[in-house]
């Protein structure tokens, strides 16, 4: 494939202001392009949000193929130990196949951000959701469905989805290693979201499905399951474009399994192409792939006008890949206020975030930002004129789609925008999120107004200001 197609795609990302973190493209099972925008790397697992559902899909496929589950199994029967109220007639009709096709009959979207703050059983919570449509007749995407699928796998097999994939050869055969999966309070993998995985390993899963479940000559998932999941074979429930966590586009030219903020696994059987993308954007990555790769390359193949390889274009692409970078730097900045606020503990006015204190440790080449709230005390070291990598427990659920990990790696940068304004930028290399803190100081350094914002989020992108005084 001509490097021009990939260069056009990278240009399209820039033009659309689509922040891509990692991209890997393979044709006929061979990698033709791999790019990582600093600070994101090939080795860092990246959160997939609802892209996780394709792994739940694989676990269900294994459980069905090995006879632990059947597509016609009734959800409220398998999960009867988690039912806390009388089961309605419509609830009693919901089957596993309805969860997979998002036709369970629920009447509202349930996001993972609704579940993550819960410390009680997620499954009990989801099973109380009313079923208002005849199962199998009404499509409505809801993450609650896939969480129930995960629970059914565990109840039927005695293993979590991750344990099942690890013990049946799925992960071993594909060579998937740097792979984690969040758990619910009641002991199930978060089937709807919470996987962190590298772009390379994500692409392997796409290749597996496109190959009909075969990897290196070995049948890992059944071909029947892969065909049903992708949607090659239609059922009564999935007559539309959505099959089992795969969605068809352009009459089956390509299929995607996606997660929030640009996480995209795309397969194009016509081109025998797999593309894995991890990102932090609101842009439609699948549409950009169609406009710049799948359609023009497919049309050129049909017309017999595929460009010949060009050494100059290949060199240009290689150079472009080497210089992919999201870590801006500015000229050295400083402010006399830095001395006034250095090593001073400021007390927060009452606020919805539970923040109690803030302090800054100001140096010539870095600033330590320390904040205390109900979860404890959290520090991030921010480089001046340089990005610094660290590990932090900083509370972030309210800017991170209700994800809160004990600690996260972070790259941090500090810049004085003017004499009274300090801006801190935090990039979390395993997440989609980029947080910006704007600290505005009074002239005498006795008061700070702090506003935190984020690039993408299911909640507010800009938090309410928190005011601190000495």
Where are these regions (language model features)?
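Short, small/polar residue-rich loop motifs at catalytic or cofactor-binding pockets
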Residues: 17-20, 44, 260-261
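Structured C-terminal helix/loop/strand segments within mature extracytoplasmic catalytic/sensor domains
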Residues: 260-329
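Active-site Gly/Thr loop motif
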Residues: 223-277
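Active-site SXXK
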Residues: 29, 47-72, 99, 148-153, ...
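Peripheral terminal and inter-domain segments
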Residues: 312-470
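Active-site-proximal alpha-helical segments within enzyme catalytic domains
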Residues: 102, 148-152, 191-214, 263-280
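A short, well-structured edge-of-sheet supersecondary motif
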Residues: 10-40, 272
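Active-site helix/loop module of the DD-peptidase/beta-lactamase fold
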Residues: 66-104, 124, 128, 157-193, ...
């Amino acid at each position: 494939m001509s490097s021009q197609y990939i260069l056009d795609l990278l240009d399209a990302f820039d033009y659309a202001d689509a922040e891509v973190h990692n991209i890997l493209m393979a044709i006929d099972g061979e990698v033709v392009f791999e790019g990582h925008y600093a600070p994101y790397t090939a080795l860092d697992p990246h959160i997939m949000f609802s892209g996780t559902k394709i792994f739940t899909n694989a676990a269900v496929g294994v459980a069905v193929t090995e006879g632990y589950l059947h597509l016609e199994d009734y959800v409220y029967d398998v999960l009867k130990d988690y039912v806390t109220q009388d089961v309605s007639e419509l609830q009693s009709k919901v089957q596993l196949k309805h969860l997979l096709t998002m036709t369970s009959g629920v009447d509202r979207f349930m996001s993972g951000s609704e579940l993550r703050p819960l410390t009680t059983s997620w499954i009990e919570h989801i099973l109380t959701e009313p079923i208002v449509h005849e199962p199998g007749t009404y499509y409505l995407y809801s993450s609650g469905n896939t969480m129930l699928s995960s629970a059914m796998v565990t109840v039927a097999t005695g293993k979590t989805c991750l344990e099942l994939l690890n013990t049946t050869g799925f992960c071993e055969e594909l060579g998937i290693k740097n792979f984690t999966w969040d758990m619910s309070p009641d002991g199930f993998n978060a089937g709807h979201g919470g996987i962190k995985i590298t772009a390379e390993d994500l692409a392997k899963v796409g290749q597996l499905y496109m190959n009909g479940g075969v990897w290196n000559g070995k049948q890992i998932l059944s071909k029947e399951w892969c065909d049903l999941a992708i949607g090659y074979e239609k059922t009564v429930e999935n007559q539309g474009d959505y099959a089992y966590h795969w969605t068809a586009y352009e009459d089956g030219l390509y299929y995607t399994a996606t997660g929030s903020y640009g996480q995209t696994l795309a397969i194009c059987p016509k081109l025998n192409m797999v593309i894995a993308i991890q990102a932090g954007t609101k842009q439609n990555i699948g549409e950009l792939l169609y406009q710049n790769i799948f359609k023009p390359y497919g049309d050129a193949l049909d017309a017999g006008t595929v460009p010949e390889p060009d050494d100059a274009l290949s060199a240009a692409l290689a150079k472009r890949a080497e210089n992919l970078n999201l870590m801006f730097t500015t000229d050295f900045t400083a402010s006399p206020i830095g001395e006034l606020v250095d090593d001073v503990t400021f007390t927060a006015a009452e606020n919805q975030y539970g923040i109690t204190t803030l302090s800054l440790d100001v140096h010539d080449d870095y600033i330590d930002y320390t904040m205390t709230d109900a979860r404890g005390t959290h520090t991030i070291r921010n480089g001046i004129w340089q990005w610094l990598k660290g590990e932090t427990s900083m509370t972030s659920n309210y800017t991170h789609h209700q994800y809160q990990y004990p600690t996260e790696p972070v790259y941090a940068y500090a810049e004085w925008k003017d004499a009274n304004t300090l801006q801190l930028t935090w990039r979390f290399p395993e997440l989609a999120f980029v947080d910006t803190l704007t600290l505005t100081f009074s002239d005498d350094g006795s008061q700070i107004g702090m506003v935190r914002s984020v690039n993408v989020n299911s909640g507010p992108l800009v938090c309410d200001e928190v005011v601190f005084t000495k």
